[in-house]
Amino acid sequence: QKQRMETGDYGPSESGLFEVDSLHRVIRDVPKPTIAAVNGFAIGGGHVLHLLCDLTIAADSATFGQNGPRVGSFDAGFGTGLMARAVGEKRAREIWFLCRKYSAQQAFEWGLANKVLPADQLRKEVRAWADEILKLSPTALKVLKQSFNTDTEHFAGIGQMAHSSLKMFSETAEAREGITAFNEKRSPDFSAYRGN
């Protein structure tokens, strides 16, 4: 958000935005299961990244949540679609529309995390899961992953549309208010935009 505030974009890229959709594609296309190890915050874009991973293991001290609408941003592709698949439409809307933080235990109970354990055991557990996966047929795993991803591939197109919309939206006063408030550590005042 600081980069976006200071320069109007997310850093050097062809479009001017951080090419997060390319990162999403890499996570989905790598022909092996991916494991998100969450130790700290999985908020906003980090929350979407863990959703994109095939498995999520979290430290019991981890915090999850969305903050896009709070800072004048959104992920209307994988961030909404995969969340609704994981937790149900109503819960996904709650997570996005209210921008609350929730615990690793809540993430586990809602189906967003596969396992929660003490932070000092996280690295060892992720390694154990990876070692277990390495004993399995790589071709079978690849085909299984492709099968899971094919069912949600339409979210990629929606995400590309949303990414273009975000680029346009990021140039508005409303988006600037969200970014400025975030960087100034204050609540944004979006009252002037209620009629949109």
Regions found by a protein language model. Name each.
Residues 1-11, 29, 34, 135, ...:
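Terminal-region recognition feature
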Residues 1-26, 42, 70-72, 153:
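Glycine- (often His-adjacent) and acidic-residue-rich active-site loop
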Residues 20, 80, 89-92, 123, ...:
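A general structural signal for well-ordered alpha-helical segments in protein cores
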Residues 57-63, 113-160, 171-173, 190-196:
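C-terminal long alpha-helix characteristic of the crotonase
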Residues 95, 107, 147, 151, ...:
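Helix-loop "lid/cap" segments that line or gate small-molecule binding pockets
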